[in-house]
Amino acid sequence: MKKVLFAVGCAGLFLGSAAFADEAAKPYVGYWAVNLNGGAGWMGIEQADCGALSGSILWGGGSPLKYEKVNVENGALVLTRTLTSKKDGKEEKKTEKITAKADSGQLAMTKVVVEQDGKETGKSEYKGNKIKPLPAKPDLAKVKFGEPIKLFEKGLDGWVAMNPKAFNGWSMKDGILSNRVLDENGKNKHGTNLRTVATTFEDFNLKTEACMAKGGNSGIYLRGIYEIQMADTFGKGVDCHNMGALYGRVTPLVAAEKAAGEWQTVDITLCDRHVTVILNGKKIIDNQPAVGVTGGAITCDEFVPGPIYLQGDHTNVDYRNMVLTPIIK
């Protein structure tokens, strides 16, 4: 007989099943770093007090996707969500199914699409590992800093294109790092991202100024894995995809952005997997946990040093006065 724990609402679980629910789900609850065979992924599984499960997965880019059903079946974690598309004018629904098996903190994951006739297609396999629990929120008043590093002091000599085959719209003039990827008709040339030559940054404070183009979209990746969104979102409400957000993870407390074309001050602190962001003098993220990498990360490993990288494949953007001050541990 199959033993199945379904992620239903708490009201749908009997008290007698709670102990089994906790035991069956225990190996999976928490955060997982997922290697997407060259890309950086993440999975988060949470369990309510009643035992009900919920889960989301980051598939390399964008934001984590929430799954409609999460259950444990014969010791394996199963997540499903409905995929809706149109074919010949008719709505067609398929099911994306993820099956994962945990063993001593390691994860073997299989992804398939279940067609309407029940046939499984598009099989892919991935590996992952359990992420260490988040440390306590750091007391930033007690943090010690080293000597500041002016990241633009050597011009472009301190930076390298991340995709040498892509269009490179980055240039440096009068201390301003500019990215120009739109032609005279506004068409995107699909430029390259840019990163520091140095890849040894750990925890730090990063200060810079950014000037967003109308409708602009860029990002500052801390250690190459956590994106602080840079975007023209002036006049919009707070959202985890707007200016200053930890992309797809943490929504700003207030909307503090300026209009496109204005220089904006950005002050970011990354310490013990917690992020603080001060935008234009207003604290919009206050020492909040980074529970996992964000879309576009260069690795799913949150415990290795990395570079600062700037997103350059979307729109035009300017940066100036970028200074990184390392935290001394």
Regions found by a protein language model. Give the residues of each.
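Bacterial N-terminal signal peptides
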Residues: 7-16
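Positively charged n-region of N-terminal signal peptides that target proteins for export
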Residues: 1-4
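Sec/Tat signal peptide C-region and signal peptidase I cleavage site
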Residues: 17-21
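Carbohydrate-interacting regions of secretory-pathway proteins
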Residues: 22-329
